[in-house]
Amino acid sequence: MNHRLAYHHTPGTGPTLVFLPGYASDMTGTKALALEAWAKSAGRAFLRFDYAGCGRSEGAFADQTLAGWRDDVLAMLDQVATGPAVLVGSSMGGWLMLLAAKARPMQVVGLVGIAAAPDFTDWGFTQDEKMYLLRHGRLERTNPYGPAPTLYTRAFWSSGEANRLLFGPVAFDGPVRLLHGDADSDVPWRHSLQLAGLLTSSDVTTMLVKGGDHRLSRRGDLALLVRAVEDVLAAVETAAVPDV
């Protein structure tokens, strides 16, 4: 890694909770800050950070790829979290958490997905959009969450296609909680059901939130997220206690 990443690390007990934002997002979102506040009050270790080219981290956004952001996650695990970690991935962050768990199977002990979007370079683009990306190298879409359009590059799209996961079993044996809103217009909730079916873990729960949109940032949504994190931590720590 030849760029510096901005991050906030809260020391505490237990596995480090690591929040992974979505595409073109950063570590100052509602969910990241709500989890950090909970972690501080509970004395739990917590880490949030910006991918390269996002937020306050170095790099140009247009130069980034999915594999590069995966490597940013791994760098945070190797250099900051260091010990066991529970990854909390929002949208694209849910894809990155799966790739990180694949690369660090002994370190990543639990997963929480929020509208997880693995393989979205496949199902999230029309055939015309894919052809446009291949021909022109970049595609801009209207951004429903801000004034500037959302940029996708051919390099990012190609990197995503090279790192697809949903073609067979997804190897992970720790506890997993998947949250998804039934009113999500960006990532259809059935993708979380598909992921739940492909995960090899026997401890997978999918929670469908009535009226929940893609961001799941309402007060009740955040409370549900905290409960999901608490549930995963409890499962991890129970499994770590030897039978007597």
Segments predicted by a language model, with ranges:
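Short beta-strand-to-loop junctions in surface cap/lid or active-site-entrance loops
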Residues: 4-15
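Short beta-strand element of the alpha/beta-hydrolase
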Residues: 14-22
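Conserved alpha/beta-hydrolase
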Residues: 36-58
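Gly/Ala-rich beta-loop-alpha elbow adjacent to hydrolase catalytic centers
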Residues: 89-97
